[in-house]
UniProtKB/Swiss-Prot annotation:
SMART domains: Elp3. PANTHER family: LIPOYL SYNTHASE, LIPOYL SYNTHASE, MITOCHONDRIAL. It comes from the Bacteria. The keyword Signal does not apply. [4Fe-4S] cluster 1 binds at residues 35, 40, 46, 274. The keyword Disulfide bond does not apply. Belongs to the radical SAM superfamily. Lipoyl synthase family. [4Fe-4S] cluster 2 binds at residues 61, 65, 68. Binds 2 [4Fe-4S] clusters per subunit. One cluster is coordinated with 3 cysteines and an exchangeable S-adenosyl-L-methionine. This is Lipoyl synthase.
Length: 296
């Protein structure tokens, strides 16, 4: 693709009072959120709608991926009370759908998998009507980590491949493209009831043919939901944006993904892994029901 640098105008609407109330509750509950740590462009809109993506396992990551704004360094000790605090916060915020993500914790024997599972179980106990989505790291392929979370039975298991295989070595520190696909494939194989989800960023130097190949690979792995968004450089220390995709390109990829059989596709400049995740979960359930009805 031709290198193009032309940043689109992005406007996000927000209810200021609702945003401030969510901000107050997040602070009062002592939550870390990826919304803040990753400098997400959608924070105003999401928090105005009381949609929060919580970040567990601390706020310091053991990796330094070139696209990510989360702090890198030596992580703090795990908070054993975090599952309880998180469950309480979900209740106070009145969340219909909660997304739980984390920093990478390569220093832990299980990569933090048991902590993830504890959070899922505690929310199930205290807010049984809330659907739960986990957005996990790859756990460095640590034995048993994936199965611990599968056993906790989140509604959605999300793990992002982020970019095309050719760009992985310089974009995703320690991560491997096919390890990420294998993680999601095993989730679907071991519990087909769990929706699987993954995401891509555009603007890192990928070619159209490479993006389409990733879609094909994802479908072979049985992934249900694909998100595609524009990479935005968090700071001058991070990877430069190679180009800004047009609305037409996002629409092209959306149509190409649906043609390949994804149940759900979100594709736009502002799309992020958990953007509109509560609404998308309802669409996912309806799409699966519709697909199953056609088989009867």
């Amino acid at each position: 693709m031709e290198r193009t640098i032309e940043k689109p105008r992005i406007r996000v609407s927000a209810d200021n009072r609702a945003f401030l109330e969510t901000s107050r509750l997040v602070s009062a509950c002592g939550l870390n959120t990826v919304c803040q740590e990753a400098a997400c462009p959608n924070i105003s809109e999401c928090w105005s709608s009381k949609h929060v993506t919580v970040m567990i396992l601390g706020s310091v990551c053991t990796r330094a991926c070139r696209f990510c704004n989360v702090t890198t360094g030596k992580p703090e000790l795990l908070d054993p009370h975090e599952p309880e605090k998180l469950a309480s916060a979900v209740g106070k915020l009145g969340l219909r759908h909660v997304v739980i993500t984390s920093v990478d914790r390569d220093d832990l024997d299980d990569g933090g998998a048991e902590h993830f599972a504890s959070c899922v179980r505690r929310i199930r106990e205290t807010s049984p009507g809330t659907s739960i989505e986990v957005l996990t790291p790859d756990f460095l392929g640590k034995v048993g980590a994936r199965d611990i979370i599968i056993a906790a039975a989140p509604d959605v298991f999300n793990h992002n491949v982020e970019t095309v295989p050719r760009l992985h070595p310089k974009i995703r520190i320690k991560a491997r493209y096919f390890n990420s696909l294998s993680l999601l494939e095993e989730v679907k194989r071991k519990d087909p009831r769990i929706f699987t989800k993954s995401g891509l960023m555009l603007g890192l130097g990928e070619e159209r043919s490479e993006v389409l190949q990733v879609m094909d690979d994802m479908r072979v792995a049985g992934i249900d939901f694909l998100t595609i968004g524009q990479y935005l450089r968090p700071s001058k220390k991070h990877m430069e944006v190679q180009r800004y995709a047009t609305d037409e390109e996002f629409q092209y990829y959306k149509e190409a993904a649906y043609a390949r059989g994804f149940l759900m596709v979100a594709s736009s400049a502002l799309t992020r892994s958990s953007y509109h995740a509560d609404e998308d979960f309802l669409h996912l359930k309806n799409a699966r029901a519709g697909a199953l009805a056609k088989l009867v």
